[in-house]
Every structure is written in structure tokens, then in C-alpha cells.
């Protein structure tokens, strides 16, 4: 994007994710062929009428992001593959095929890279109702946005939170996760993981870290509060921690989420909410409309400006507010639009986004009646 660091760090983050090779795509195709064969063998051992089938689901979308007058076109497909192996084993993976296109500084047609990425590929073993063992490459369970809100169909605003790059998106290793009731009114969920160093392909790298997340869920209030911690086991061996909040009131079509994260790279928070106008009685078409908003703030850490740019972080302390509308055209299809404003010593900027998102689900086998 342009030369101003504040106006370009979001675009650099998208372009950096897009500058990937074909290695992940080749590995994903090989993995798909292998696990589908294994799934068929495992399903053949189950009684007739109880055989689960693989499922291909995911999202697709196209968006236009305008930052301080500079436009970037983004198109992506994010397939998710679920392959059950008997009653206790599950293989799951998510790929990302994304194109990020911009006009060159001197003018001309849009151009840019198209990436094929593998976000995660993991095997889950359901040991009992309270523990699931995960091995492979998985989404790092720090906070809630990366794991629960990242897909374009789920998120209410398409711009990434400013603090998202503070933690690695994926880890390579093993994870234990699960949940259990503490009482009739309180449930506890947890995740504990360890990740090994991976220095092979640029987009399959991971750090040597250990960490965990704990959440307390109150079913009566439909509210969750929790905290995350991560320790780097190499180089500076720094600690990182965060807190999260989620709430969906019983009587209102409202979703509230918030996160705080702190590390040597920076710190900050975001709070967002989305309200579906499904209770409107005067004009039925308004029931398909969702109103969303977010406020957030980022504080620079002790790393250099070049290191911050490489991670996709803002180059200076930044405040941002954003307002958006999502209209659900039909089941599985929505149109989005939003406007935001950034405030920073590096320069203020307007943020516009419009686009459309689609979700799909396809069984990869015959479903028994």
C-alpha cells in the first residue's frame, strides 16, 4: 500500500499472508486423499446405520478494503475438512486460498499474489467426556478471536483487531482441552498446549512455547470470562498473558466479545458487539439486518518499528472505532459494509470495507437415513 506506515500495516499483513508457495496446497491434497481412505476403512468397521461420513464445509468471500483512499481487493475461500475415524478419532483441517490485489503506485491494473495456506491439520482423540487430546498443527488457544471468531462468516466486522498479531496463529505440537461442570451453575473449560520449533517452510514455522487458557462459563447468563498465558521457551523467554469475555443474553439477539493481551511486542484491547434486528415487528426485512460495532486500542511494545511491521502490528499507539452492517440475504449468504476511523501519532485514517460472505457444507459420503 502507500508509504505511510500507519496506513499500510493492515495491507502489509494481508499481503504477507498472501505471499506463500504451493507447498501447503500439495500437502493438503495428499493429506485429503490419505485421510479419506483411512476414514472409509474406519467407517467400514462400524455397525450399519452408525457410520459417520467426512464433511467439507467452510466459507468464501470477496471484499474491498479502502484505507485512507488506498484500495485493496481481497478474495478468499476457506475450506474446512472433518473426517471422523470411528467413535473417538477425528481429523480436521482448514485451508486458506486468498488473493490480495492492489493497483501499483503509478497506476495500472490490479495485481497481487494468490496464496494457498494450511491454517491447521490436526488429529483429535476423545479420551473421555472431559479430555480431548490433539496432535499436529492447531490454532493457538490464546484469547478467543483466533479460534472462535476468525472465519469471515462468523466475525461481525471484517477488519482484524489491532492486537491479533501479538500471538502466533498456529502451533505445532500437542494440546489437551476439554471442560466439566463445577456446579449446576458453573462450567469450566480449559486448554493446555506445548509447541515445538519448526523452521522448515516459511509458512509452517512455529516457536517453542507452552501455554494454556481457562474459561468460566455461566450457562444461566450465557456468559464466559477467562484468561490465557503463554511462555516462550527460546530466545528472550518472555511471558504473555490475556483475558477474554463473551456474552449472549438470553432475551436479546446480542453478542458481546472482548479481549485484552499484553506482551513485550505490545498490548491492547478490543470490545465489540453485534445486535440482530430479529425482534423488529414493523418491517420484516429488517429482521435480516445486524448492527455491529467495535472499539479498540493498541500500545506499542519494546520491539523496533521494523519488527512491528514484520509482525503486522501498528507502528505507534493507535485508537480505532468501527461501525458496520451485515445483511443476511438468505441462509448462508450475507452482505457486509463498515466504516472505521484510526487515530495515531503516525497519522489518522478512514477505513472502509464492503463485501459478501458465503458459507457451505457438503457431506463427502452417503448419509444413512
Placement of each model-derived feature along the sequence:
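Bacterial N-terminal signal peptides
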Residues: 26-40
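Outer membrane beta-barrel
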Residues: 46-56, 69-197, 208, 215-222, ...
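N-terminal secretory signal peptides that target proteins for export/translocation
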Residues: 1-24
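Outer-membrane beta-barrel "beta-signal"
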Residues: 176, 348-369
Amino acid at each position: 500500500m502507500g508509504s505511510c506506515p500507519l496506513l499500510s500495516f493492515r495491507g502489509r499483513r494481508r499481503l504477507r499472508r498472501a505471499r506463500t508457495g504451493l507447498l501447503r496446497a500439495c500437502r493438503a491434497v495428499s493429506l485429503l486423499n490419505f485421510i479419506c481412505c483411512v476414514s472409509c476403512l474406519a467407517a467400514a468397521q462400524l455397525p450399519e446405520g452408525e457410520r459417520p461420513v467426512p464433511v467439507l464445509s467452510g466459507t468464501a468471500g470477496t471484499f474491498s478494503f479502502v484505507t485512507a483512499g488506498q484500495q485493496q481487493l481481497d478474495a478468499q475461500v476457506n475450506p474446512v475438512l472433518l473426517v471422523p475415524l470411528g467413535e473417538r478419532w477425528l481429523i480436521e483441517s482448514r485451508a486458506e486460498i486468498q488473493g490480495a490485489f492492489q493497483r501499483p503506485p503509478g497506476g495500472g491494473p490490479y495485481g497481487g499474489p494468490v496464496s494457498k495456506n494450511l491454517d491447521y491439520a490436526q488429529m483429535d482423540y476423545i479420551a473421555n467426556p472431559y479430555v480431548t487430546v490433539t496432535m499436529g498443527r492447531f490454532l493457538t488457544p490464546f484469547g478467543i478471536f483466533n479460534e472462535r471468531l476468525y472465519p469471515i462468516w462468523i466475525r461481525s466486522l471484517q477488519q482484524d483487531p489491532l492486537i491479533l498479531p501479538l500471538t502466533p496463529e498456529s502451533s505445532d505440537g500437542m494440546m489437551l482441552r476439554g471442560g466439566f461442570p463445577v456446579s449446576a451453575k458453573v462450567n469450566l473449560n480449559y486448554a493446555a498446549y506445548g509447541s515445538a520449533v519448526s523452521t522448515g517452510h516459511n509458512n509452517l514455522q512455529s516457536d517453542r512455547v507452552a501455554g494454556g487458557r481457562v474459561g468460566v462459563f455461566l450457562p444461566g447468563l450465557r456468559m464466559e470470562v477467562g484468561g490465557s498465558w503463554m511462555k516462550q521457551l527460546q530466545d528472550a523467554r518472555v511471558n504473555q498473558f490475556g483475558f477474554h469475555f463473551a456474552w449472549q443474553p438470553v432475551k436479546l439477539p446480542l453478542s458481546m466479545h472482548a479481549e485484552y493481551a499484553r506482551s513485550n511486542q505490545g498490548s491492547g484491547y478490543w470490545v465489540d458487539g453485534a445486535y440482530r434486528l430479529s425482534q423488529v415487528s414493523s418491517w420484516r426485512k429488517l429482521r435480516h439486518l445486524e448492527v455491529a460495532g467495535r472499539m479498540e486500542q493498541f500500545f506499542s511494545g519494546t520491539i523496533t518499528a521494523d519488527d512491528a511491521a514484520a509482525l503486522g502490528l501498528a507502528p505507534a499507539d493507535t485508537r480505532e472505532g468501527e461501525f458496520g452492517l451485515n445483511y443476511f440475504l438468505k441462509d448462508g449468504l450475507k452482505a457486509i459494509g463498515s466504516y472505521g476511523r484510526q487515530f495515531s501519532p503516525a497519522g489518522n485514517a478512514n477505513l472502509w470495507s464492503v463485501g459478501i460472505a458465503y458459507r457451505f457444507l457438503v457431506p463427502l459420503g452417503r448419509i444413512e437415513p
